[in-house]
From Swiss-Prot:
<feature type="transit peptide" description="Mitochondrion">
    <location>
        <begin position="1"/>
        <end position="8"/>
    </location>
</feature>
<keyword id="KW-0472">Membrane</keyword>
<protein>
    <recommendedName>
        <fullName>Protein PET122, mitochondrial</fullName>
    </recommendedName>
</protein>
<dbReference type="GO" id="GO:0005739">
    <property type="term" value="C:mitochondrion"/>
</dbReference>
<dbReference type="GO" id="GO:0033617">
    <property type="term" value="P:mitochondrial cytochrome c oxidase assembly"/>
</dbReference>
<keyword id="KW-0810">Translation regulation</keyword>
<dbReference type="GO" id="GO:0005743">
    <property type="term" value="C:mitochondrial inner membrane"/>
</dbReference>
<dbReference type="InterPro" id="IPR008732">
    <property type="entry name" value="Pet122"/>
</dbReference>
<dbReference type="GO" id="GO:0070131">
    <property type="term" value="P:positive regulation of mitochondrial translation"/>
</dbReference>
<dbReference type="Pfam" id="PF05476">
    <property type="entry name" value="PET122"/>
</dbReference>
<keyword id="KW-0010">Activator</keyword>
<comment type="function">
    <text>Required for expression of the mitochondrial gene for cytochrome c oxidase subunit 3 (COX3). PET122 seems to work by directly interacting with the small ribosomal subunit to promote translation initiation on the COX3 mRNA.</text>
</comment>
<keyword id="KW-0999">Mitochondrion inner membrane</keyword>
<feature type="region of interest" description="Essential for PET122 function">
    <location>
        <begin position="185"/>
        <end position="254"/>
    </location>
</feature>
<keyword id="KW-0496">Mitochondrion</keyword>
<keyword id="KW-0809">Transit peptide</keyword>
<dbReference type="GO" id="GO:0003743">
    <property type="term" value="F:translation initiation factor activity"/>
</dbReference>
Length: 254
């Protein structure tokens, strides 16, 4: 089978793209690159453009570079940079990208031993994937489905790292929207007893509890939620639940 290899951009064009990127003119750099449809960029320029685009929250450049240059050539991208790109994609509503960044990172690192740094990167990429799903399906899927995605990504992390409500603002917001509906309130409480997946991390259920407590109307409902939780679980870390109760001014013993 004949393989067609794209030629690299000329030195002059490369210099202009690089200069625009370094000067923070990402729209100009992207426009120049778009004009080079039949050419490819070298890895150094690719990483420079991605790093500048992430620093300047230029989602158009990130998306274009990803689909036109990284994915077709399966080029490695440094994990920390992927995290920065994912953060931009999340808040610029390029909500399919974080899952692709995570998949790419996992594929690129599948055959090597992981380090503490690798674990931190995977945590962050998974966290942003969960947040992107919650943000993108804020009004269109039930809380149970969002919770299932959370468990699939976060509860299965090696080492069972602490999972804190403050790190999942989109998930927390989605809980609030869901709990405005009567049927979703009942479904949320039911999650304390019937889990869609086996729970591995002791911090997972307390995060769900804290998210529900953050949105219940008042102390009476909070006491009921705590009672429901305690019927099924003992000895789990309730730090976030205690913080939420304190922030909301409820006088409840946890």
């Amino acid at each position: 089978m004949l393989t067609i290899t794209k030629r690299l951009v000329t030195t002059d064009v490369r210099s202009r793209i690089l200069l625009s990127s370094l000067n923070g003119k990402m729209s100009d750099a992207l426009a120049l690159l778009r004009q080079q449809q039949q050419t490819s960029v070298d890895v150094e320029l690719l990483h420079t453009m991605l790093a500048r685009a992430a620093a300047l929250a230029h989602a158009d450049t990130i998306a274009y570079m990803w689909y036109q240059h990284v994915m077709p050539r399966r080029l490695p991208v440094e994990g920390r940079l992927l995290c920065e790109m994912a953060g931009v994609a999340l808040y610029q509503d390029r909500l399919f990208l974080p899952a692709q960044f995570l998949q790419h990172y996992q594929a690129m690192n599948r055959d090597r031993r992981t380090s503490p740094e690798d674990e931190l990167i995977e945590y962050e990429l998974r966290r942003i994937k969960v947040e992107a799903f919650a943000r993108g399906t804020m009004h269109s899927t039930a809380l149970r489905e969002k919770w299932k995605v959370f468990l699939q990504e976060m509860d299965t992390l090696p080492g069972q790292p602490p999972l804190r409500l403050r790190d999942f603002p989109q998930m927390t917001k989605a809980m609030g929207i869901a709990l405005m509906q009567q049927d979703e309130q009942a479904a949320a409480l039911a999650l304390f007893g019937r889990q869609p997946l086996v729970i591995k991390n002791e911090w997972s259920l307390p995060l769900l509890l804290a998210g529900v407590l953050w949105h219940v109307p008042g102390p009476a409902q909070a006491r009921r939620v705590l009672a429901e939780f305690r019927q099924s679980y003992r000895g789990l870390p309730l730090l976030d639940a205690e913080l939420v109760i304190k922030r909301r001014g409820f006088e409840i013993n946890t």
